[in-house]
C-alpha cells in the first residue's frame, strides 16, 4: 500500500512540474521515468 501512496505523490509532483513548464520537453523523460517506476 505504501507504493500506491508514493506513486500518487510522484504523479502529483510531476503534474506540478508539467504545469510550470507547459511543454513537450518534460513528456519524453517523464514517460521513460514513469515506465521505469512502473517496473518496480
Curated annotation (Swiss-Prot):
The gene is comC. Its main location: secreted. It is found in: Secreted. The keyword Secreted applies. Residues 1-24 form a propeptide. Pfam families: ComC. NCBIfam families: ComC_Streptocco (NF033214). It comes from the Bacteria. The lineage of its organism: Bacteria, Bacillati, Bacillota, Bacilli, Lactobacillales. This is Competence-stimulating peptide. Keywords: Competence, Pheromone, Secreted. Acts as a pheromone, induces cells to develop competence for genetic transformation. GO terms for biological process: establishment of competence for transformation.
Amino acid at each position: 500500500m505504501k507504493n500506491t501512496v508514493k506513486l500518487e505523490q510522484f504523479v502529483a509532483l510531476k503534474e506540478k512540474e508539467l504545469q510550470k513548464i507547459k511543454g513537450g520537453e518534460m513528456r519524453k523523460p517523464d514517460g521513460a521515468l514513469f515506465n521505469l517506476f512502473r517496473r518496480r
